Design a protein with these regions (language model features):
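Core AdoMet radical
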Residues: 84-104, 108-131, 146-159, 175-201, ...
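Acidic (Asp/Glu)-rich catalytic clusters
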Residues: 108-112, 137-145, 167-175, 207-211, ...
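N-terminal [4Fe-4S]-dependent radical SAM core
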Residues: 2-118
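Structural recognition of alpha->loop->beta junctions
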Residues: 78, 140-147, 234-249, 321, ...
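Conserved C-terminal portion of the radical SAM core fold
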Residues: 200-260, 277-300
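Generic structural signal for well-ordered alpha-helices
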Residues: 98-105, 134-139, 164-168, 203-206, ...
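Auxiliary Fe-S-binding modules of radical SAM enzymes
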Residues: 2-45, 54-56, 255-341
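Hydrophobic faces of well-ordered beta-strands that scaffold small-molecule active sites
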Residues: 56-60, 117-119, 150-152, 176-180, ...
Length: 341
């Protein structure tokens, strides 16, 4: 794609990606304002484009653990990961999948009526179990009439062939997304956060998932200790250029949560964390680097406020989103502005 200096503000045309019935492919050759009016391809816009209505994600707990917690690779997990396995907002695992879905629906009932949902298995590593355990769990979620898609958070080193085959079968019934927690491409940073696998493991997992026609979403943390801004942009650029193409990305502000190893390190020797303005500046640079057709599933993320140690400003999500939207609009920047391939 040729780099362009045009700004989205000079292009009032609204871009509507091709619907599932049009048979046409989206034209991402020029910077556009997407269907929700934003200059980046938000998850909300993509969901509405695909399903014709607003879709909510329901966080579920499959009752699994993680090889980085059960002693296979380690016992403490990644240093940023809470005791809830990054699924602090998920429904409790001691209830059935259907019961979890209904409880989660009730929590958002004031926001959506007669809607559809993404069943999101979020806590810990959701393919770290035998297929005999996973299949009834995921099948129950997909069978729910209000579930439009299944999303599974996992590690790239926990996708054996029989699990990939299961996910491919489920994907023929309803869309299946696989969310991989990469966080960084830099091996020193990966060792520092105790990620527990090397970059080639991630690369191989993405290739196998894409070969199975599964949707791949990658999590990145911005603000890891001792990483420079240039290194963070290198991670985003790497994902932007990766082949086969990655479908979606989550850009996650580093949250320091009480009860994690990261919080212990921060309290012993505080390290710099982003101010809101610094984070927004970096976020806009990331958006410019991403290909126009990559869906941005997240631009900051949330942690339980009762556990949040830093950065303090991230408690006020509304203030952040308003400030970010204003800064992005005034910058004239748009997704894909600096993307070349």
């Amino acid at each position: 794609m040729k780099q362009t200096t045009q700004t989205y503000l000079s292009l009032p045309e609204t871009f509507h990606p091709a619907s599932t019935t049009s048979g046409k492919q989206p034209d991402f050759s020029m910077p556009r304002c997407y269907s929700d009016g934003r200059p980046y391809y938000s998850l909300n816009a993509w969901l509405k484009d695909q399903f014709g209505q607003k879709i909510y994600k329901l966080a579920l707990d499959g009752g699994m653990t993680c090889p980085n917690r059960d002693g296979t690779l380690g016992t403490g997990g990644c240093i940023f990961c809470s005791h809830g396995g990054s699924g602090d907002f998920a429904e409790p695992a001691h209830t059935s999948v259907t019961e979890q879905i209904e409880a989660a629906k009730a929590r958002v009932a004031n926001k959506i009526k007669d809607g559809k949902y993404v069943a999101y298995f979020q806590s810990y590593t959701n393919t770290y179990a035998p297929v005999s355990y996973l299949e009834p769990l995921f099948s129950e979620a997909i069978a729910h009439p209000d579930v439009a898609a299944l999303s599974i958070g996992t590690r790239p080193d926990c996708l054996p062939p029989d699990v990939l085959e299961l996910l491919a079968r489920l994907n023929r019934r309803k869309p299946v997304w696989v969310e991989l927690g990469l966080q960084t491409i830099h091996e020193e940073s990966a060792a520092r956060i105790q990620r527990g696998y090397s970059l080639p493991v991630f690369e191989n997992a993405v290739r196998e998932l894409k070969a199975a026609d599964l949707t791949v979403i990658v999590h990145v943390i911005l603000g890891l200790p001792d990483e420079t801004k240039a290194q963070m942009l290198d991670t985003v650029r790497y994902l932007a250029d990766f082949q086969p193409a990655i479908d979606g990305i989550k850009l996650q502000l580093l949250h320091i949560l009480r009860g994690t190893k990261l919080a212990e390190l921060y309290e012993q020797a505080p390290f710099p964390v982003f101010s809101m303005d610094e984070y927004i500046e970096l976020l806009i640079e990331c958006i410019r680097l991403l290909p126009p057709d990559m869906v941005i599933h997240r631009i900051s993320g949330d942690g339980p406020k009762k556990l949040l140690v830093a950065p303090e400003w991230s408690r006020n999500k509304r203030a952040f989103l308003n400030t970010f939207s204003k800064a992005l609009r005034e910058s004239g920047c748009f997704q894909g502005q600096d993307f070349t391939n």
